[in-house]
Amino acid sequence: MQSKRLTTRQLTTIAILAAISAVLFMVEIPIVLFYKLDFSNLPVLLGAFAMGPGPATLILLIKSLLGLLHTSSQGVGELADFLMGFAMILPAGLIYQRHKTRKGALVGLIVGTIAATIAGVLSNLWLMIPFYGAVYGMPVEQIVAMGQTLIPAIQDEWGFVLMITGPFNLVKWVLISAVTMLVYKPLSPLLHHQG
């Protein structure tokens, strides 16, 4: 089996996209409770479409490691973001690499959005909520109560992640996917070093 090596141009593209992604990671828009929207995975998705999920994983990893330099979550937020980003770029990148059409991109983004939303729900349930509860001395019931102020039907942490985390991540990934669809083709010559 022959290994594929990255070219100098690909490494340069990875570095540039990772740097842009790391900067975007610091620009957060508060949405609801402690959830914030950022577009740092946009360059990662562009990398997945241009070069595939392998190089995109490097972009995502570099962004996450750089995010550790200014984290307030002691790395847990970056880990959750990495898991969601990977769940997005793997199917999106693989599908688009096999079907390099607008429809292939759309199908890849839809499958990736579903996978990333599920990863977001599970990483919040198993990582983020327990972590924030431990760090801030909040029992899970108190975090659930925060959610109940928005949606009274929430009864437990599963309800919290299904009614708040899931919809938030779905909207986040739909927005990132929409922007990706708008900018990939115009940026494609730059990403493929044709411009």
Where are these regions (language model features)?
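Loop-helix junctions at membrane interfaces
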Residues: 1-195
